[in-house]
């Protein structure tokens, strides 16, 4: 079948097995040229394997992989014109920052002047001007990862692949680097796929999110689509906190929620808490109050014994003056249920 | 000759921590005094006589054989040691543990036994020697035999110094090199070899000094012909047999000085090759 040039990466019916473990199963995926896509999933979901298959670091058992329209399935890593960034940087420790970035350029036999100029350009791009003569051991984790990124970008890859690029960094650096990567992508516009298990990271950085579980794609969509319209219970519960209730639960009786599916999913911020009984509420009792910063988490126990987790803004919490053991009334603002044939 | 030490005050020793005191006393008894005694013994001769003994043609030829073959043996083990260490760290195969402990055998085997075994196997009628003899190459009782014995006894060093460094290498760095367009050979020379080079050099240095000092196996597999395959340690032994202690100590001192210089050079190379561990 003819492949569209505008498609940066096309993965078609790709499977990969390690021993008896099915890492990736019949995956189809299309990444538009110039877009920034996150592969999101728990560990063992096959997201890293899929990335390595795209890179050519693993060979698929079946299926085809197309890069910028050409069939790259049988191409070796070195011929695929990809840039790969590893979780633990994988810098060449015996080479200076400058030499690390120049590695791919020197292999391509560019002139010395050209290499030097390109390296300086990249040092500036990743904001490491002046650190070119350091060795990796003299850099912080965040700086090392930026060197790794510069090294990958130096050879002007058609596709940039990042495997948990911020996974080894501490929370603060991770946040900074995330928004920096987003800005960088807006400048460089190279087709980018990155792997993460952090849904917040995926939401913040990516144009499109591919949610994976058990080697399969659960859903592909924009961050908003994924959050607002999760396609499966797995996506619903992976992408944010969720209460899972039987459809017979007390709380749905007053509201008249009627679903044939036995399980109903309810986001904590979709539970309204009131002091006085208002229409469509059911009585409940506060079990515990947990302060999460800008939100307050209230654990409420329904009369049937079911415990729900509800989130409410601080202001609302102050207005209500909630206390443990207090009698309240709760109401689901929005709930979601899925057809039966799934597994979490 | 009696060795009179000047009456020194040792109070400085009591001001040191116990570990330091033990270090000083131990090294003094085991290393410093014997080495100093060797040089003093040589130095008790007139300078012209020392020079004469040190540079007599048979000794010079023995130095050449000893250092030349030791360096060659160390270099050979430098190459093959890396390959063996690579196999041991990168592949899993049945009997790997046994294979691994075989590497250390040259350390455990009495060197005379090693020499005898090699001389038998590599003689004209031996298991391996019989296939090489038709090509006009004789191994046992020639320089080739000396080299073989030196390779044998210094085999484990490079394997053991390189193994941990290979285990430490990130496979991801090799994958990164490939993704940047490096061929397998470019990856070896640019990514794998530089970080293990300090270990290779350390192993080569150890193997070299072991080979220079080797006596037991070489004396058996060598023809011990002066100007041909006679090594310096065997020459020293012959001098001692003739009660020529002065000749023996002078040759020994020369051997020691040369070894020190070569070890310093290898050490300097090693420091240079690990300069990035800042």
Swiss-Prot record, chain A:
EC top class, as a word: translocase
Localization of this protein: Cell inner membrane
Q: Which domain of life is it from?
A: Bacteria
SS bond partners: none
Catalysis: reaction(s): sulfate(out) + ATP + H2O = sulfate(in) + ADP + phosphate + H(+); thiosulfate(out) + ATP + H2O = thiosulfate(in) + ADP + phosphate + H(+)
Q: Could you state a single Gene Ontology molecular function term?
A: ATP hydrolysis activity
CDD domains in UniProt: ABC_CysA_sulfate_importer
Q: What EC number is given for this enzyme?
A: 7.3.2.3
Residues the entry annotates as binding ATP: 41-48
Q: Which stretches make up the ABC transporter domain?
A: 9-239
Keywords for the protein's UniProt record, in alphabetical order: ATP-binding, Cell inner membrane, Cell membrane, Membrane, Nucleotide-binding, Stress response, Sulfate transport, Translocase, Transport
Q: Which SUPFAM superfamilies match?
A: MOP-like, P-loop containing nucleoside triphosphate hydrolases
Membrane topology classification? Peripheral membrane protein
Q: What induces it?
A: By sulfur deprivation.
- NCBIfam families membership: 3a0106s01
- Subunit: The complex is composed of two ATP-binding proteins (CysA), two transmembrane proteins (CysT and CysW) and a solute-binding protein (CysP).
PANTHER family, per database record: SPERMIDINE/PUTRESCINE IMPORT ATP-BINDING PROTEIN POTA (PTHR42781), SPERMIDINE_PUTRESCINE IMPORT ATP-BINDING PROTEIN POTA (PTHR42781:SF4)
Q: What does this protein do?
A: Part of the ABC transporter complex CysAWTP involved in sulfate/thiosulfate import. Responsible for energy coupling to the transport system.
Q: What is this protein called?
A: Sulfate/thiosulfate import ATP-binding protein CysA
**Native source organism of the sequence:** Synechococcus elongatus (strain ATCC 33912 / PCC 7942 / FACHB-805)
From Swiss-Prot, chain B:
* Key words of the record: Cell inner membrane, Cell membrane, Membrane, Stress response, Sulfate transport, Transmembrane, Transmembrane helix, Transport
Show the CDD domains listed in the entry: TM_PBP2
Q: Matching SUPFAM superfamilies, A to Z?
A: MetI-like (SSF161098)
Q: Which residues form a coiled coil?
A: none
Task: Provide the primary localization.
Answer: membrane
Q: From the Swiss-Prot or TrEMBL record, what is one GO molecular function term?
A: ABC-type sulfate transporter activity
> What's a Pfam family this protein contains?
BPD_transp_1
Show the stretches that span the lipid bilayer: 22-42, 67-87, 102-122, 139-159, 188-208, 217-237, 246-266
Q: Which PROSITE patterns match?
A: ABC_TM1
The segment(s) forming the ABC transmembrane type-1 domain are 63-266
* Record's note on what induces expression: By sulfur deprivation.
Any single GO CC term annotated in Swiss-Prot or TrEMBL for this entry: plasma membrane
Q: How does it sit in the membrane?
A: Multi-pass membrane protein
Cysteine-cysteine disulfides: none
Quote the subcellular location field of this record. Cell inner membrane
By its UniProt entry, which Gene3D superfamilies does this protein fall under?
MetI-like
What's the stated role of this polypeptide?
Answer: Part of the ABC transporter complex CysAWTP (TC 3.A.1.6.1) involved in sulfate/thiosulfate import. Probably responsible for the translocation of the substrate across the membrane.
State the family named in the UniProt similarity comment for this chain: Belongs to the binding-protein-dependent transport system permease family. CysTW subfamily.
Q: How does it assemble?
A: The complex is composed of two ATP-binding proteins (CysA), two transmembrane proteins (CysT and CysW) and a solute-binding protein (CysP).
UniProt-recorded name of the protein: Sulfate transport system permease protein CysT
Q: Which organism is it from?
A: Synechococcus elongatus (strain ATCC 33912 / PCC 7942 / FACHB-805) (Anacystis nidulans R2)
Gene name? cysT
